[in-house]
């Protein structure tokens, strides 16, 4: 007896998303793109997006079905807005990786006059974000379909600068190796404005950790390492061109931002105490470069 691959996918998906169960969830859309299989499903008051690529592993983003509910569901997604502690009034924003559009939507509401560029390699993801996750680009937002490395190189040649850069193109299934190298980070660094902040959503539990950390340190010098205990294994790297603010300054800024971020379920006043400048990696680890970047073997 043959097994319907969609049924099998759904069963595996629900197992990975415990406590969501197959009896309580409903697939509302599934589509194969050039890069991955994409599933949208609903569970109670959530709607979730799942990507499936080479090895059957998945990364999910979930949002509340009520379009008036602004809360960001996953803690690791909320963590990326810690970058606002370093630049609370970004006028130009660059986001690499769209997903369901939770972070761009939040930033667009917080800063309606700011210009935002979003780079997403998969056009199907952009379509699904708009159709199922209430992502509506404003007149100040442009979604660019293409490879982020190419976009950043071209932006650098044009002399473009950004106050807030978010690297969020990685997932548990596949890491774009060319977006982790020292050369790529140098190109990205050139796009930062004098007060700009780089935010990288990445992993804290992999063999890649030492190499990635050493590579970021080689390009940016000191950076804040932000982890939430007992969370998904994600971490957020935060750095700037200028000297980094101390813990006291971060806490003061968190208190100033707290009320604005409360509708998104971001308890930013708790974030500074979870950030550290201390190196907890092998500082002699080999740097990731365009010639050496075995990211998917090391994860």
UniProtKB/Swiss-Prot annotation:
**Residues binding S-methyl-5'-thioadenosine, per UniProt:** 36, 120, 147-148
Q: How does it associate, per the subunit comment?
A: Homodimer or homotetramer.
Which residues does the Swiss-Prot or TrEMBL record annotate as the active site? Answer: 168
Locate the PABS domain: which residues?
6-252
Q: In which pathway does it act?
A: Amine and polyamine biosynthesis; spermidine biosynthesis; spermidine from putrescine: step 1/1
What function is annotated for this protein?
Answer: Catalyzes the irreversible transfer of a propylamine group from the amino donor S-adenosylmethioninamine (decarboxy-AdoMet) to putrescine (1,4-diaminobutane) to yield spermidine.
Q: What is the lineage of its organism?
A: Bacteria, Pseudomonadati, Pseudomonadota, Gammaproteobacteria, Vibrionales
Q: Which organism is it from?
A: Vibrio vulnificus (strain CMCP6)
Q: PANTHER family of this UniProt entry?
A: THERMOSPERMINE SYNTHASE ACAULIS5 (PTHR43317:SF1)
Localisation per UniProt entry:
Cytoplasm
- The catalytic activity of this protein is classed by the Enzyme Commission as 2.5.1.16
GO BP: spermidine biosynthetic process
The UniProt entry's sequence similarity note says: Belongs to the spermidine/spermine synthase family.
Question: Protein name, please?
Answer: Polyamine aminopropyltransferase
């Amino acid at each position: 007896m043959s097994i319907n691959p969609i049924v099998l996918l759904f069963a595996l998906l629900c197992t990975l998303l415990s406590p969501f169960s197959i009896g309580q969830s409903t697939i509302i859309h599934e589509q194969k793109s050039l890069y991955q299989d994409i599933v949208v499903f609903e569970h109670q008051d959530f709607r979730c997006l799942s990507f499936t690529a080479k090895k059957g592993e998945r990364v999910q983003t979930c949002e509340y079905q009520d379009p008036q509910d602004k809360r960001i569901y996953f803690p690791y997604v909320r963590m990326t807005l810690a970058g606002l502690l370093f630049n609370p009034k970004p006028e130009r924003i660059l986001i690499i990786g769209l997903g369901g559009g939770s972070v761009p939507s939040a930033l667009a509401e917080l800063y309606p006059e700011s210009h935002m560029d979003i780079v997403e390699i998969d056009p199907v993801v952009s379509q699904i974000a708009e159709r199922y996750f209430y992502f509506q680009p404003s007149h100040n937002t442009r979604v660019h379909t293409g490879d982020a490395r190419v976009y950043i190189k071209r932006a650098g040649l044009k002399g473009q600068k950004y106050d807030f850069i978010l690297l969020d193109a990685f997932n548990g299934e596949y890491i774009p190796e060319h977006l982790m190298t020292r050369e790529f980070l140098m190109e990205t660094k050139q796009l930062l404005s004098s007060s700009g902040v780089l935010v990288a959503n990445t992993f804290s539990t992999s063999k890649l950790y030492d190499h990635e950390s050493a590579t970021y340190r080689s390009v940016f010098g000191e950076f804040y390492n932000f982890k939430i205990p007992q969370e998904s294994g994600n971490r957020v790297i935060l750095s700037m061109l200028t000297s980094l603010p101390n813990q006291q300054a971060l806490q003061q800024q968190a208190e100033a931002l707290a009320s604005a971020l409360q509708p998104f379920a971001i308890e930013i006043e708790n974030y500074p105490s979870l950030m550290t400048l201390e190196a907890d990696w092998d500082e002699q680890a080999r740097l990731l470069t365009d010639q050496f970047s075995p990211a998917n073997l090391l994860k």
